[in-house]
From Swiss-Prot:
Residues 19-109 form the N-acetyltransferase domain. It comes from the Eukaryota. Disulfide bonds: none annotated. This is Protein NATD1. InterPro entries: Acyl_CoA_acyltransferase, Gcn5-rel_NAT, GNAT_YJDJ. It comes from Mus musculus (Mouse). Belongs to the NATD1 family. Expressed in the heart, testis, kidney and lung. The gene is Natd1. Transmembrane segments: none annotated. Pfam families: Acetyltransf_CG (PF14542). PROSITE patterns: GNAT_YJDJ.
């Protein structure tokens, strides 16, 4: 008999929970139990500079605001750790334009 995966908070209409894996240098949201994930990847490109490189949300979950939660978590991490950020990812560039908070803008690298 197959075991059903318990529904994620997202599927139940609950809050979106972003996890930060510092070792893998990624932020993620579990979408379907432990199988599907939305991710935001970053790399350190200097001692205090991170490159926010790529955001990916599976097609079936797009349009639900998941990428916004990932972008906010990553930018809040930059602020909390007093880092600078280079924005390679087009989505994070768009997020900052739509949310031009001073604490984000002052940490951007060209």
């Amino acid at each position: 008999m197959a075991h059903a995966t318990p529904p994620s908070a997202l599927e139940q209409g609950g809050p979106i929970r972003v996890e930060h894996d510092r070792q893998r240098r990624q932020f993620s949201v579990r979408l379907n139990g432990c199988h599907d994930r939305a991710v935001l990847l970053y790399e350190y490109v200097g001692k205090r500079i991170v490159d926010l490189q790529h955001t990916e949300v599976p097609d079936a979950y797009r349009g639900r605001g998941i990428a916004k939660h990932l972008a906010k978590a990553a930018l809040d991490f930059v602020v909390e750790e007093d880092l600078k950020a280079h924005l390679t990812c087009w989505y994070i560039q768009k997020y900052v334009k739509e949310n031009p908070l001073p604490q984000y803008l002052e940490r951007l690298q060209p």
